[in-house]
C-alpha cells in the first residue's frame, strides 16, 4: 500500500508528488514529478463574478447614452470630473429658469416680471425703470421706500456681469474672516 503526498515547491507552475511506502522497506525509492498548468473555468463567467462581488445574479450596470466617458479612457462614470456648460446662441439667456417649462400659459418678458418692494407689493421692471428716472425725494414719497432700493433694482434692467463658474466661486465660511487677494 502506498500513499501519495503533495510537497509544496518554490515555483508556482510545478508540483512534486512523492510516493511513500508503508513500513516495508523497498530498494527503489522513486519520485515522480508532474508539471503542468491547471486552468479553472466557471460555467458562466457573469454568474461567478456576481457571486464573488456579493451582488445578485443578473444585476449589471447599464450606462445610458448621456453618461460621460471621463477623460476619454473608455471608462464611463456617473460622476463627471468637469463642469461643462453648453454654449448658447448669442441672444439666448443663460439663466436656468429659461430652460424649464413655466407653469403659466403666458410667456414672460423682462418687462412683465414681478419684483417685490420692501413693503411686499409687486411691481414690474417697467415701473422700476420709471422710478429710477425720478428724483430720490419723489421716489421716496411716491413708493414709501428708500432711494437705494430703487437704484439697486434699476441696475437689474441693464446687462449684468457674468457669474463665476463653480471652480472660481469660493464657498462662504461662517465665522472666519474673508481673505483678500491671492
Swiss-Prot record:
Residues 113-128 have a biased composition (Basic and acidic residues). Residues 1-18, 129-149 have a biased composition (Polar residues). Its main location: nucleus. Residues 1-30, 76-182 are annotated as: Disordered. It is found in: Nucleus. One of its GO terms (molecular function) is protein phosphatase 1 binding. One of its GO terms (cellular component) is nucleus. Transmembrane segments: none annotated. The keyword Nucleus applies. Keywords: Nucleus. Residues 150-162 have a biased composition (Basic residues). The keyword Metal-binding does not apply. Belongs to the YPI1 family. Regulator of type 1 phosphatases which maintains protein phosphatase activity under strict control. This is Type 1 phosphatases regulator ypi1. It comes from Aspergillus fumigatus (strain CBS 144.89 / FGSC A1163 / CEA10). The gene is ypi1.
